[in-house]
Amino acid sequence: MRNYIKDAADLDEVELSGWAEDIRRIKSIVFIILRDVTGRIQVTVKSENVKNFDEVYKINRESVLKVHGTVDHQSRSKSGIEIIADSVEILNAAEAPLPLGVVDKVQADLDTRLNNRYIDLRKDENLIIFKAQSTLLWGIREYLNRLGFIEVHTPKIVAAATEGGADLFPVKYFERDAYLNQSPQLYKEILMAAGFEKVFEVGPAFRAEKENTLRHLNEFTSIDIEMSFADHNDVMDVLENTVKNAINTLKNNLGDELNKHGFNIDSINGRIPRITYREAIDYLNSSGFQMNFGDDFSPEAARVLGERYKSFYFITEWPVSLRPFYTMKKDDETTKSFDLQLRELEICSGAQRIHRYDDLVNNIKNKGLNPESFTFYLSAFRYGMPPHAGWAIGLERLTMNLLGIKNVRETTLFPRDRTRLLP
């Protein structure tokens, strides 16, 4: 049975499988640094011990090997142990040269890395990003399950825009036109009418936005919740505690490994500050900006707010003009909505939704949209739709912001942006 490198120190005999990360040859001995997902270990291959020594002697870096041998607990290697091999099976020999180095100090440009992602992801500093992402998602799921949320999966091929915009990818659906879904928003709300009361979804979302920035993707993983008999304050509380639980799960399980790679994760101590959109505008104008009510925040304005609040903070009561048609109004100008920010970066957006049919139809019209395009959605509001609220987080952007990474493509396994459709 295969053993993992992390367990070798507790064993006397092992069978390890992994990649030959580095190779040194000295006459009748080959020293191999073998790597698997749990770590690295030195394997010493001697000509008198291994039948296919000549074949092993010629292997290239990143060849895939299966090694059987004894554990030398008195080794002078860096780890204090090494494997004295009695057999080495070459499972797959790597070609040379590699398209991208794994242990080389030379940094390749991002396009080269993404074009050879299967090599790029072998590096510890890249693997840890996705271990962190997986752990964050585990913490989010665990907390929402504990609160009694039901995980659901909604359609990703739809007949009309979720939010009424033009940023949709068209697809041919047999004889009809369809689109890749921007968001599960409308389906989450329909499930509130179905009596599910508390749902969450983790799934792909698609935006045909032409922005080509460090923060934009055209396909991303969206984490959405919707909750009945709740307002925007209720789901802000859920969001705050969800993020706290995710961060604690991350630190408890990967804290040392993250610190080793220079990732320092923000903690949430006490309540997250909440400021209104008007308060944010007033502060920015007192700092030299010239913003009017209804203006969105420029990157520079967001940076100034981030310098003031340092870590996490909510911006609440956004203008009606800046929110989708399903957002509940607080008054004629503002909505019961919020964004969660980490310094200058948006983490999450949410709101209380309109739950009365006539109000929703009027708001759809006020946004310049046709209610007939939303018949399947609107019908759910005619037969007992409860008050409800929710939010959505982009997993890749959450990972980027928490780890302090500058480009969201680095927190996406195989990014899809304005110019990239491969690999």
From Swiss-Prot:
Cofactor, how bound (note): Binds 3 Mg(2+) cations per subunit. The strongest magnesium site (Mg1) is bound to the beta- and gamma-phosphates of ATP and four water molecules complete its coordination sphere.
Major site of localization recorded for this protein: cytoplasm
SUPFAM superfamilies reported for this sequence: Class II aaRS and biotin synthetases, Nucleic acid-binding proteins
Binding site for L-aspartate: 163, 207, 349, 353
Record bears the keyword Lyase: no
GO terms (BP aspect): aspartyl-tRNA aminoacylation
A Pfam family of this chain: tRNA_anti-codon
Annotated positions binding ATP: 207-209, 215-217, 346, 394-397
Record's subcellular location: Cytoplasm
Amino acids binding Mg(2+) 3: 346
Class of the enzyme per the UniProt entry, highest EC level: ligase
Family, as annotated: Belongs to the class-II aminoacyl-tRNA synthetase family. Type 2 subfamily.
Purpose: Catalyzes the attachment of L-aspartate to tRNA(Asp) in a two-step reaction: L-aspartate is first activated by ATP to form Asp-AMP and then transferred to the acceptor end of tRNA(Asp).
Subunit structure as annotated in this protein's UniProt entry: Homodimer.
Name listed for the protein in its UniProt record: Aspartate--tRNA(Asp) ligase
Organism: Picrophilus torridus (strain ATCC 700027 / DSM 9790 / JCM 10055 / NBRC 100828 / KAW 2/3)
Lineage of origin: Archaea, Methanobacteriati, Thermoplasmatota, Thermoplasmata, Thermoplasmatales
